[in-house]
Amino acid sequence: MPVFHDQQRDALRRMYLEAWQRHQEGMPLTPLQAQVADVVALHPEYHALLTPDALDRDWKPEQGQTNPFLHMGMHLALREQVSTDRPKGIRDVHVVLTRRHDSAHEAEHRMMEPLGAALWDAQRQGVAPDEQRYLAALRSL
């Protein structure tokens, strides 16, 4: 794996650790740190993993492991998409799913599989994600 990728991954993971630590210590947070801390707070199963040792750890989906940083990052990505309503209509889908599941957090969990599939397809094909196909998958939930 390229060194640049490892440095980016470590910096991103360090941001989660720092935001959570600042939140726990009651220190002021930037808006991004507050968003990160909010997502971390919703995932107590990951709290013990937010240590410097996690910076280098790999989670292997083929072994049934969930990468907590990827999972929480998808929450942040979905929240950004909903806040900007991009793709157009995703906010409405989120509202419907939130009502159906009585939880915005659960709605985001339902939306993760279509998001992951859209990103995977785009990466595999070397193109931008197909927003309309992604939105159609979300609407079918």
PLM regions: where:
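N-terminal leader/targeting peptides and immediately adjacent processing regions
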Residues: 1-45
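Well-ordered alpha/beta subsegment
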Residues: 109-113
